[in-house]
Design a protein with these regions (language model features):
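Asp-based, Mg2+/Mn2+-dependent phosphohydrolase catalytic module
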Residues: 17-20, 33-136
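Short, acidic loop-to-helix structural element flanking the phosphoryl-transfer center
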Residues: 1-28, 34-38
């Protein structure tokens, strides 16, 4: 059962709405299983803001393998090099980077190690900073 205390990170809804209004395709690429992913997305109210929902049990290998990101990029019809992957965990950074995505890191529980700093395109404190990548 999902915890009652599940909270959406700051600016997620606003950022997804911003991207949707700009016609930017979006996907979630998560290490979470499908039923839990769908439950979480519905619970926090962002399911309708995402074009695709990709989870680890839809691919051969989970994060840090690139599979989940490669599948997400394919699902939205984009080459990974044309995609920005927003990640908050080192395994996710590795996964997105190995897929060829431009990785933007938003720190959460685990800081980005020095060994991964060269694979990220940018680091932002929260998702409100993501809009600048689309305004440049």
């Amino acid at each position: 059962m999902v915890s009652e205390g599940l909270e959406l990170k700051p600016f997620v809804k606003e950022t997804l709405a911003f991207l949707k209004n700009r016609g930017v395709k979006t996907a979630v690429a998560t290490a979470t299983g499908e039923s839990r992913m769908r439950q979480y997305l519905d619970m926090v109210g962002i399911s309708d803001l995402l074009d695709e929902k990709i989870c680890t049990n839809m691919v051969k290998d989970g994060k840090p393998a690139p599979d989940v990101y490669l599948y997400a990029c394919e699902a939205i019809g984009k080459d990974p090099s044309d995609c920005i992957a927003v990640e908050d965990a080192p395994n996710g950074v590795l996964s997105a980077s190995r897929a060829g995505c431009n990785v933007v890191f938003v720190p959460d529980l685990t800081p980005l190690g020095d060994d991964l700093k060269d694979v990220v395109f940018g680091e932002i404190s929260d998702l409100s900073g993501l809009q600048r990548f689309f305004d440049e």
